[in-house]
Each structure stands twice: as C-alpha cells, then as structure tokens.
Amino acid sequence: MYTGADVKVEGERLSNKKEKAIREAMEALARPLPNKRILGIPFKLMMYNLAGDSVKERSIGGWIRRKFGEPPVLLSSVSIDRNNAVLQSDLQNQGYFQAEVAGDTIVKGKKARAEYTIKPGDQYTINHVDFGSDSSALQTAIDQCAGKTLLKNDDPIDLGVIKAERERIDAYLKENGFYY
C-alpha cells in the first residue's frame, strides 16, 4: 500500500523558509495522493475493505463501499518518472532552470512510499525589464501601460507572473482598440 511521497530539498544557498516552501509545493504536486486518514486511521479504506470484495452493487455493502469507501492506493499506480517530470517542470516555472530531481521507491513490509530528492540550484531573477522600442501606435500604447508592470527588477522569474503580465498588457491593448 502506498503511504505518500517524501521530498528532500538539497541546496547550499537556500534559506530554511525557501526550502520549506519548495518542499511543500513539491509534496502537493506528487501523484497519486495516498489514502485519506482521519486521526491517523485510513477510515475510508477500512470501510472499503469491510464491505468485502464480492459485494453486489445493489446491496447495503455495495452502498457502503461506494458511499464511504475508498479503494487502496497501490505502489503500482505511482509513476516515478512522470512525477519527476512534473516536479522538474514546476521548478523551471519558478525560475530554477538547472534543478535536478531524482525519485525512488522505498518498500518496508506491505507499505511503500516514494522519495524525491531535489537539488534546485540557483533561482534566476529578472535583471532588466524592457518592452522594446518602436515608433508604432502599438508600442506607444504598451509604453503607456509599462509603468504598472508586474515584472520588477531582481524579482525571481515566475511563469505565473509572466503570464499575468502578458494578460494585463493584452487587456489594456484591447481596451484601447488593438484587437489583432
């Protein structure tokens, strides 16, 4: 039975706060999620198992299994390679372009967990924001809205902020008659 993912962040120049933020974000991305627990007990899994294997769909046991049960999450449903790719992609979206992710499974008895080791490297930052220079009406409109930019010098590169800036400029241009 799969009990979840553990993420270890290895970085020389990371603050504890940043290391914790990376670890929590990566643990949230790892799939599949283990069976839910209430006070440390996998209650839904217990209900699923108590209903039995050969329960008819229309019986009370079948209803309990469907309504309150949750099938076990097995190690065979865990794709280490896919999770490695997802974690790597998210780190790159946060500006860690040279991050390394390695995953492995650890089996102890009937329980198994995935363990991911992340070496994020240096986080790239925005050195300078330049919207180009041109004498067209479009460039003039972009220059007018450039003062409210979401991209600031020395901020870490974040794909979400870059997309938000692109959408902000797009909305501004559409409000000013640029629809092409």
What label would you give each PLM region?
Residues 1-180:
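Interaction-mediating elements
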